[in-house]
């Protein structure tokens, strides 16, 4: 069963075997991002309402917004879990990192003149890879690899070059069974990144596509969501 959301519409459970759908047991209006954490709780970012946490039965456990927490903005665009903490990519406020046990929130953000700060403050997607490194897809500032020891940013390059992206706005990220990282861009199609070599492969057949989401179905297949076109099994 998949938990899926159509941005600005409602979330649904989808039975992969039958294609049947059923509603979720929590408020699913205007959902921007969803995350199921390791405890099975569901974190939901509703547009301009911060972030709420629900148990698997739909009971609201907690909500975080600018009025009751250190969250700097209520527009949260992406959610990911890393070492038991909830990372929140925001629209203009950088990355907020929540400790669910204490409610404490720390922030990574762009600081003008500080080359060690986050390169961008609008983060559309977050991904925790198998090496426990974080990846952030930004608005017009490329792909950011965040490690304990520092950050590295990958920008767009000219067609045919393999040391950068086909498009600098990143919508989705997924690491496959072979540790290759699939990157969905906003109009540049799908890029495949090899962390071992640092090289990118631009998949030309997807050029100009807006790749809203990528995830794995099994070790040989990906499920890809293209903007305004639906889901595709690849």
Stretches found by the model and what they are:
Residues 1-234:
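Carboxylate-rich, polar loop motifs that coordinate divalent cations or form catalytic acidic clusters
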